[in-house]
């Protein structure tokens, strides 16, 4: 099985999949290798890219909060509503920007920041971000919602405030938290991560961990890089990923996915 991240891994900086990367994934699938796409993106956006790749694949969205098998079987791991509201309250006290991803839409605190939105010059990227969203002023606007929450983003350009939030954040042990290169925290249920999702898929299809390759670049890829028998980091990836990986491939602008897979699989 090949588990692969989307942004800054399979996708280049324009949100395109290169022909080389696309073809090697198709070749792997034709050889009987299961393909799993694991991303922090929402399910709708992820499925558009999966459809473009053109092979049956498992889809893992919102950092492992939604796991959809090839046959459509779906596992949802949502956050307890009361607990996430307490976390949001902590963020508001520190005047931090946040957004909340639910079953229905994305709730942006005040307004979306530029780096919260994916930009691209191709049809997939443009369509993949047409997602319903609302602007809220405070948690008072969402506290009584009847929706399931999957992921909370905490964002700020000031690292000190982010660290202060981590010191004060309630229910830390109930969540899985990862940091992105854009200085934002991604907060999900403690049982929702790319690594745990990859294990669920492997168990479902009876795939040994010895037969798993994971490719990623960012903090939310760490758990799957550690779980896989072979963890591949992108050259443009975070240092923590490179240190844990078995191999560092070329960047997302240089067909890194192609060269990483070719290194370990004869296709």
Model-inferred region functions:
Residues 8, 41, 64, 216-218:
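Active-site metal-binding loops of divalent metal-dependent hydrolases
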Residues 32-36, 56-57, 151, 210-211, ...:
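Short active-site oxyanion
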Residues 1-4, 23:
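Non-catalytic pre-domain segments flanking phosphatase-related domains
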Residues 56-63, 118-120, 177-179, 231-235, ...:
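Short hydrophobic/aromatic-enriched beta-strand-loop microsegments
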Residues 1, 12, 18, 186-267:
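Mg2+-dependent phosphoryl-transfer enzymes with acidic/Ser/Thr/Gly-rich catalytic loops
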Residues 94-96, 101-215:
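Conserved acidic, metal-coordinating active-site core of Asp-based
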Residues 53-55, 62-63, 171-173, 227-228, ...:
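Short, structured coil segments at secondary-structure junctions
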Residues 16-121:
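Active-site phosphate-binding/coordination module
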């Amino acid at each position: 099985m090949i588990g692969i991240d989307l942004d800054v891994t399979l996708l280049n900086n324009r949100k395109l999949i290169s022909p080389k990367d696309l073809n090697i994934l198709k070749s792997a699938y034709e050889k009987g290798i299961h393909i799993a796409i694991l991303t922090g993106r929402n399910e709708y956006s992820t499925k558009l890219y999966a459809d473009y790749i053109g092979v049956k694949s498992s889809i893992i969205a919102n950092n492992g909060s939604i796991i959809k098998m090839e046959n459509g079987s779906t596992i949802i791991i949502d956050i307890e509503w009361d607990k996430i509201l307490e976390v949001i309250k902590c963020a508001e006290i520190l005047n931090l920007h946040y957004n909340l991803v639910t079953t229905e839409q994305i709730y942006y605190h005040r307004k979306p920041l530029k780096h919260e939105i994916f930009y691209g010059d191709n049809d997939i990227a443009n369509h993949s971000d047409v997602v319903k969203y609302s602007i809220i002023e405070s948690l008072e606007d969402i506290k009584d919602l009847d929706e399931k929450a999957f992921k909370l983003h905490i964002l700020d350009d000031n690292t000190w405030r982010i660290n202060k939030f981590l010191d004060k954040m309630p229910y830390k042990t109930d969540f899985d938290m990862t940091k992105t290169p854009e200085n934002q925290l991604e907060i999900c249920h403690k049982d929702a991560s790319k690594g745990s999702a990859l294990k669920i898929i492997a168990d479902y299809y009876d795939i040994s961990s010895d037969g798993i390759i994971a490719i990623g670049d960012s903090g939310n890829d760490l758990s799957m890089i550690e779980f896989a028998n072979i963890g591949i980091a992108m050259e443009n990836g975070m240092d923590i990923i490179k240190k844990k990986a078995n191999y560092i491939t070329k960047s997302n602008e240089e067909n890194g996915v192609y060269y990483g897979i070719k290194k370990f699989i004869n296709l």
